[in-house]
């Protein structure tokens, strides 16, 4: 399973990229708005940091407008992926953009039926949301497993991006469930890096080294 980072914060992207474990970035209008910067400026800077898929989301709801917006996003950089909401209009836009060779990421997926429709419309990626399903008492990991099974049975090339990842356990369970990618907030990556036994082990090594020098 590969890792994308889910943020529009350039400093977080730089830190994660420096550690060598991310291969792409996902953004959305909320994340970009949080940074208080121009969308194009943020995306251009991100593409200069990470050499991999960068998802930029449309804000229109009608297919024709999404298509026009998607074409603009795709022209920013060859690595751009157009993120489109899971609606009928969204899938109509996915079909056209796919035919034009533009990669798409269908977002806000909450059922296996939605994922299957998005895949058949030509989506490069589908993004099922784990945390938001958990919030309403559903099981997001069952959804990931169901989508992965369906795609494998039918030889569907669309990749699964696990989104709305809230904690390290989500990440491990997504990997076990068959997700191709997990898009993870920087704070969750920080949690994944740490373990108390690692810290105590380092402290002991350093203490032993200092004692040996005396």
From Swiss-Prot:
Q: Its Enzyme Commission number?
A: 2.2.1.2
* GO cellular component terms, semicolon-separated: cytoplasm
| Cell division in keyword set | no
Name the InterPro entries for this protein: Aldolase_TIM, TAL/FSA, Transaldolase_3B, Transaldolase_3B/F6P_aldolase, Transaldolase_AS, TSA/FSA_arc/bac
One biological process GO term for this chain?
carbohydrate metabolic process
**Active site positions:** 83 (schiff-base intermediate with substrate)
Q: Which pathway features in its UniProt record? A: Carbohydrate degradation; pentose phosphate pathway; D-glyceraldehyde 3-phosphate and beta-D-fructose 6-phosphate from D-ribose 5-phosphate and D-xylulose 5-phosphate (non-oxidative stage): step 2/3
Cell compartments where the protein resides: Cytoplasm
Q: Offer an example of a GO molecular function term for this protein.
A: transaldolase activity
Principal localization? cytoplasm
Q: Which reaction does it catalyse?
A: D-sedoheptulose 7-phosphate + D-glyceraldehyde 3-phosphate = D-erythrose 4-phosphate + beta-D-fructose 6-phosphate
UniProt KW keywords: Cytoplasm, Pentose shunt, Schiff base, Transferase
State the family it belongs to.
Answer: Belongs to the transaldolase family. Type 3B subfamily.
What does this gene product do? Answer: Transaldolase is important for the balance of metabolites in the pentose-phosphate pathway.
Protein name, entry field:
Probable transaldolase 1
């Amino acid at each position: 399973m590969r890792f994308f980072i889910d943020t529009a914060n350039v400093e977080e992207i730089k830190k994660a990229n420096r550690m060598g474990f991310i291969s792409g970035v996902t953004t959305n209008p909320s994340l970009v708005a949080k940074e208080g910067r121009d969308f194009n400026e943020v995306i251009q800077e991100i593409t200069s940091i990470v050499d991999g898929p960068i998802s930029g989301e449309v804000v229109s709801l009608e297919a024709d407008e999404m298509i026009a917006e998607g074409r603009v996003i795709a022209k920013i950089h060859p690595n751009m992926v157009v993120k489109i909401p899971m609606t009928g209009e969204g899938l109509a836009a996915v079909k056209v953009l796919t035919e034009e060779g533009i990669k798409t990421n269908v977002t806000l997926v909450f059922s296996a039926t939605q994922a299957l429709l998005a895949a058949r419309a030509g989506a490069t990626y589908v993004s099922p949301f784990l945390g938001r399903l958990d919030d309403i008492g559903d099981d997001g990991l069952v959804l990931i497993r169901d989508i992965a099974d369906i795609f494998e049975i039918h030889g569907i090339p669309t990749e699964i991006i696990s989104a709305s990842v809230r904690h390290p356990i989500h990440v491990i369970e997504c990997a076990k469930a068959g997700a191709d990618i997990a898009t993870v907030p920087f704070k969750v990556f920080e949690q994944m890096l740490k373990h108390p036994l690692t810290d105590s082990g380092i402290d002991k090594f350093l203490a032993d080294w200092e004692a040996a020098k005396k």
